[in-house]
């Protein structure tokens, strides 16, 4: 890649229909985990105008009112009026959960199947990434895209901009010089709004009250602002588009700055390595960068269903490493247990912590529950690398 370039990432608000689905799925997971931390959950959600469909595979002894959980989630997001696209009070909720296949369960249950350790819940490949572009060790474009829609939600909920509605999308294009971000070329924010609002008033409020408070002022050099570029955004949420769990996997991770293995996160308990190993990958990569071993770090981890040990672990630092990538990979294997059970224990994942992850990014947020954001291995890695 050339050292001078433009790079873009997007985010969406909690009221985006796909994120509504993600949050319902993770709210279901949390409600189950409050009673049964060892449950097997794969909760999928579809939401459309006035309709929510809950489907997937759940094996648990927990007694959960799934319909009430879905309604409470929609209410918390802010869809309390049918004019907004869906109303938690009047929407229909259909429940169609099956149990986990026993063929899968025997490969995941510890002490069953061919590998007596807890095996991976499926085959697949997962990526973790970190870089030094922000204090959170996240790529800058996705970081600021998240902060913009997070700010939109804040001003909507606290009443400072009461004409805002729940659905919104942001996009940030950064200008890089010599491989480092130096300014913002373009910011896009499309936000749902009350029908009586005029475009010029929306544009002014968005730029001054939403965007400027959360992006570096020194990066706003000849920046182009595109606010509701279609001119109107009244119909939104599940009425504007059908929402589905797992359809915002790039928003959930690194905004396209790193590869993605394809597996979504929300609604999945941590026996699914799609989720738990991606969290572990972030934990590993962030500690590599925090230790000063590299300015950028990417790890790929892969698994076979029913097998505990990863089938491969690869680290690349894009030429920024202080020691070789092979040496860093060896340190990773020595300091991190990447077997499914090891990940669950290392990151304390059998807790009802997941609904909070389902909007504004699973990574790069300093929340106390987000154990994969800790840098508690950095000192040991640095010492082992003799730096």
Curated annotation (Swiss-Prot):
Which cellular component, as a GO term, is one annotated location?
A: cytoplasm
Write down the required cofactor(s). Mg(2+); K(+)
Which residues does the annotated region (Flexible loop) include? 100-110
E.C. number(s) listed in UniProt? 2.5.1.6
Q: Which reaction does it catalyse?
A: L-methionine + ATP + H2O = S-adenosyl-L-methionine + phosphate + diphosphate
Q: Which residues bind ATP?
A: 16, 167-169, 232-233, 241, 247-248, 264, 268
- Report the main location listed first in the record: cytoplasm
One GO biological-process annotation of the entry reads: one-carbon metabolic process
Q: Where in the cell is it found?
A: Cytoplasm
Kindly list the positions annotated as binding K(+). Answer: 44
Give the quaternary structure: Homotetramer; dimer of dimers.
What this chain does, per the entry, is described as: Catalyzes the formation of S-adenosylmethionine (AdoMet) from methionine and ATP. The overall synthetic reaction is composed of two sequential steps, AdoMet formation and the subsequent tripolyphosphate hydrolysis which occurs prior to release of AdoMet from the enzyme.
Kindly provide the name given to this protein in its UniProt entry: S-adenosylmethionine synthase
Q: Which organism is it from?
A: Herminiimonas arsenicoxydans
């Amino acid at each position: 890649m050339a050292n001078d370039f433009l790079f873009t990432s997007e985010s969406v608000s909690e009221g985006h229909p796909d994120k509504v689905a993600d949050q319902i799925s993770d709210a279901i997971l949390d409600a189950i985990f409050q009673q049964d931390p060892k449950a097997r959950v794969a909760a999928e959600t579809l939401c459309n105008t006035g309709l929510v469909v809950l489907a997937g595979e759940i094996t648990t002894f927990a007694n959960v009112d799934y319909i009430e959980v879905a309604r409470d989630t929609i209410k918390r997001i802010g869809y309390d009026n049918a004019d907004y696209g869906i109303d938690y009070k009047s929407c229909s909720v259909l429940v169609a959960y099956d149990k986990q296949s026993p063929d899968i369960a025997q490969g995941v249950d510890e002490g069953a199947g061919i590998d007596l350790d807890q095996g991976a819940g499926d085959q697949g490949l997962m990526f973790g990434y970190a870089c030094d572009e922000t204090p959170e060790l996240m790529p800058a474009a996705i970081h600021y895209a998240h902060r913009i829609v997070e700010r939109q939600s804040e001003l909507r909920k606290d009443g400072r901009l009461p004409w805002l509605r729940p659905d919104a999308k942001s996009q940030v294009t950064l200008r890089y010089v010599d491989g480092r971000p130096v300014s913002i070329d373009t910011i896009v924010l499309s936000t749902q709004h009350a029908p009586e609002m005029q475009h010029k008033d929306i544009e002014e409020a968005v730029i001054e009250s939403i965007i400027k408070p959360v992006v570096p002022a020194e990066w706003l050099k000849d920046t182009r602002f595109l606010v509701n570029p279609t001119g109107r955004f009244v119909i939104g949420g599940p009425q504007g588009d059908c929402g589905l769990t797992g359809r915002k996997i790039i928003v959930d991770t690194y905004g396209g700055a790193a590869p993605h293995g394809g597996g979504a996160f929300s609604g999945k308990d941590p026996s699914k390595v799609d989720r738990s190993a991606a969290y572990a990958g972030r934990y590993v990569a962030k500690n590599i960068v925090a230790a000063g071993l590299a300015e950028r770090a990417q790890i790929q981890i892969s698994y076979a269903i029913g097998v505990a040990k990863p089938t491969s672990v690869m680290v690349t630092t894009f030429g920024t490493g202080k020691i070789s990538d092979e040496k860093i990979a060896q340190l990773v294997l020595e300091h991190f247990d990447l077997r499914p059970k090891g990940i669950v224990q290392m990151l304390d994942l059998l807790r009802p912590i997941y609904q909070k992850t389902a909007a504004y990014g699973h990574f790069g947020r300093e929340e106390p529950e987000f154990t994969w954001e800790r840098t508690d291995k950095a000192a040991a890695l640095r010492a082992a690398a003799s730096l």
